[in-house]
Structure formats: structure tokens, C-alpha cells
Amino acid sequence: MKAIVYSQHGLPISNENSLYDTDVAKPQPGPRDLLVKINAIAVNPVDTKVRNGAPTETPRILGWDAVGVVEAVGAEVSLFKVGDAVFYAGDISRPGSYAEYGLVDERIAGHKPRSLSDADAAALPLTSLTAWEMLFDRLEVKKEEQAALLIVGAGGGVGSILTQLARKLTHLTVIGTASRPETQSWVKDLGAHHVINHHQPLAEQLAAIGQPTVRYVASLTHTDTYFPQLVEVLAPQGKLALIDDPATLDAMPLKRKAISLHWELMFTRSLFQTADMQRQHEILQQVSELVDNHTLKTTAGEHLGTISAANLRKAHALIESGQARGKIVLSGF
């Protein structure tokens, strides 16, 4: 089958060997696996991080967002059947979605939203799982509680879903941060009650909207830069969740306010085969339903054409430039 791989980490994306086309054997499903014929994928920042930073002894297939049709199932599969259209973010320890076929454990896949094209649906799994787990599993927000949530980087892939989930599924006051006018408009359109600029002091802006402290913070970008300000605006016994990778993070400033710190990584359940791994199937099923009843909308941005090394190099370059708006999707071979 066709696949796009890298075999030498850290090459600049302008180098044709940073991602290249090849042929590999079609995989065979294990007991809980679906063999999926992949129709569309999305590209995420994690793709570029792995390509740049993870050495590999054999050519590696990246990609952790996919939409396709189930072609075969393992002997113990019970949630899906051949012919089902599915979407998933996959398992970072297994070959990814830059290929004609892929394997995914049924416990971390969902039925694709019927109302979306394959490409638009491909934008959803990784960011939806991350946002949902952050909001309801890490921060443990109760849907009926009255409190405020500050989302730092609300216009990005995860932030765009998190803003929608918080506004549509909870009673939280949702405050998003964005710096560019077009991103501020985007975040407002997604449902944020307030949008403030993270390039200006947060405490002053929160006080100006009558919300001097917040119970919850979802820090999606540059946590180390904003950390002192986040501690300042968090209420006593508040909760801070993050997804990025600061080199170091001194947690001591959290002690005085008894603020709890929560890291979200949507790959954890599949990496460690946790007892609740099937929760990701359940989340994706709910996301699919919310999309089909028009509660959530896709965050697909740019469609870069077919799934090829040349187009994936363009996608990686866009992400590395910081200029991507919305999720980058590709479809077909």
C-alpha cells in the first residue's frame, strides 16, 4: 500500500527526504482492531514534533487523525462492522494515518458524523478528544456549575473545540484569549462570552469585564510565559490544565492558593491500555452526534489536496510557520 514516511528525524521540511512516498505491506488486524481504508486525514502539531524530535530505526508513518471505511475487523470486535464509516485519532505508539490503510483499536474509534465530508470530519478527532478530556476528565467541570473558564489560545485547534464544548455543554462563563483581530472574531463566533488579548496583562482585562478571578484555566500554548499571570487570576482552590510542553514548570507558586495542576494528553489511554480506554470511543460517538445535530462545527481550515509527501511537506511547513488557521486536511490518494 502507499504510505508517506520519514526515516531521519530533524530534517528541515524543505528537504524532500523529510517526508517521502513509499510502499509498505498492508497491515493485518489484531483481535480488537479495525482495518480502515483511509479516505482523509488531518495534520497536527504533534506530527511535526515527532518528525523533528523522534529518532526512528525504520521508516515511520506519522498522522493521528483519520476518516475512512472499515474493510476488516478483528475476531473480538463488537462496536463496528465492515462498511462502517469511522473517525479516530489513533495511538501514537502505532503506525499513523499517512497511508492507504491503517489499524485502530475499536475502543478509540467512533462512527463518523454523517453530516460532514470525510475531509471536514478528519479535522475533529484529536482536538475533540483533547478538549473533552481536558474539560470533563482533568478539570472535572460539572455541566450545571456556575463558574468561569479562561482558555489561553482559544483560536487554535484544541481551543476552537474547547470553546464550543464549554459554551454548548456547560453553564460556564467562557473567556477566550486571542491576539489577532480575525482570531478574536473567530473565537467570538465559536461562542466565547468574552475575548481578551493574551499579549496584554490578563488581570486588568479580566477585571474590566467583571471577572477578576476564574475557577478554571485551560492553558493551550506558551504556558511557561503566562504561568505567573495564570496563578494571579486563578481563584483559591482553582484548577489549571495544560497540554503544551514547557521545558520546566515550577509548581510552588500554586501552593498558597491550593491550585491543582492537570496535564492532558489524549494518547495516554491508548499508550497504557487503561481500563477506561473505551471512553474515547464514547466521546467520539457523542462528538459525532453533536456535529450532526449542529451543536458543534468542524474546525477544518485549509484543504491541501491529496495525501502525498509533497502536500504533507506543505502542511508541515504551514504548521511550523505558525500561519495555519483551522485544521489542515487532505483527502484521497
Residue map of PLM features:
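Short amphipathic alpha-helix with an adjacent loop that forms part of the alpha/beta core around
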Residues: P201-P212
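NAD(P)H dinucleotide-binding glycine-rich loop of Rossmann-like/cofactor-binding domains
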Residues: A89-G153
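Glycine-rich beta-strand-centered segment in the early N-terminal region that forms part
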Residues: A25-A42, V50-P95, I108
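N-terminal Rossmann-like NAD(P) cofactor-binding module of classical short-chain dehydrogenase/reductase
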Residues: F87, R215-A218
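C-terminal capping/lid region of NAD(P)-dependent oxidoreductase domains
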Residues: E289-E302, R313-F333
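Short, glycine/polar-rich helix-capping loops at beta-to-alpha or helix-loop-helix junctions
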Residues: S97-Y98, S179-W186, T248-A251
